[in-house]
């Protein structure tokens, strides 16, 4: 939803499948609700949604517990590994933006809620398309994933950059924006290409203009409410934000 997989489709599709296997259908909105978290935490948070808990109790005669979450996470891993490459196309504009940032001496760090074995598939597919971040940190590499700041701060260490207030966190999820804020970084929310709208590129492009504007406005409002310093549609539009951040840093401003 940030650099690849327009609409953040890969995990959402698999979460729906996992709950179907457990006999409790969930909606795509329910599958997306905790997006950005470590995937086991994500499954647990879905089981905490009141409507899902009610369906689960109706089906199984009890509420979901830790063993259910463990079992669904065990189902999730192979399903996700099997389909990742189907959703690995880079989001338009990614390569040009990364080239420009690197020409300005900016290092590129990546964070993800995927496990390391899943991330290796994404990194391989991204590299084949010409994109390779300088550092990648998974939720499984640190004590806790989003919205905690640990993945961002591990990237700071890996990249040996300082000060933190000169770093920028770009994300398509609310927990990802919170992650950046908690790390003390500037934040740029991507409202259209990721989880907030949750549509593949072709489906987004096919929407009537009025529907696009309604959905876009809702996503922008949610990201601003989460505290994002800037919100744009996709990665292709974020370079002016960096120009503004540099101006604000020169004035002594901090996130």
Spans of features found by a protein language model:
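Residue-level marker of regulatory loop/turn positions in helix-turn-helix DNA-binding domains and
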Residues: 90, 111, 144
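Ser/Thr-glycine-rich phosphate-binding loops at phosphate-binding pockets of nucleotides
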Residues: 2-3, 112, 176
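Asp-based, Mg2+/Mn2+-dependent phosphohydrolase catalytic module
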Residues: 95-103, 115-255
């Amino acid at each position: 939803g940030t650099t690849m997989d327009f609409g953040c489709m890969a995990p959402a599709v698999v979460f729906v499948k996992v709950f179907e296997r457990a006999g409790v259908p969930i909606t795509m909105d329910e599958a997306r609700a905790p997006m950005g978290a470590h995937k086991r935490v994500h499954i647990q948070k879905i089981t905490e949604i009141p409507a899902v808990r009610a369906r689960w109790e109706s089906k199984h005669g009890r509420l979901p517990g830790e063993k259910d979450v463990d079992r669904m996470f065990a189902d999730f891993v192979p399903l996700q590994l099997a389909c990742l490459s189907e959703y690995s196309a880079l989001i338009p504009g990614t390569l040009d933006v990364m080239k420009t940032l690197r020409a300005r001496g900016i290092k590129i760090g990546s964070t993800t809620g995927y496990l390391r074995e899943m991330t290796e598939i994404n990194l391989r597919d991204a590299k084949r398309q010409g994109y390779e971040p300088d550092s990648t940190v998974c939720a499984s590499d640190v004590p806790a994933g989003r919205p905690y700041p640990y993945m961002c701060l591990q990237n700071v260490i890996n990249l040996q950059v300082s000060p933190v207030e000169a770093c920028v966190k770009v994300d398509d999820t609310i927990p990802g924006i919170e992650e950046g804020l908690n790390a003390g970084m500037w934040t740029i929310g991507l409202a259209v290409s990721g989880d907030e709208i949750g549509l593949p590129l072709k489906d987004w492009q096919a929407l009537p203009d009025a529907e696009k504007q309604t959905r876009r406005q809702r996503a922008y409002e949610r990201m601003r409410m989460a505290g994002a310093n800037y919100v744009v549609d996709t990665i292709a539009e974020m370079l002016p934000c960096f120009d503004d951040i540099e101006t604000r840093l020169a004035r002594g401003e901090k996130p």
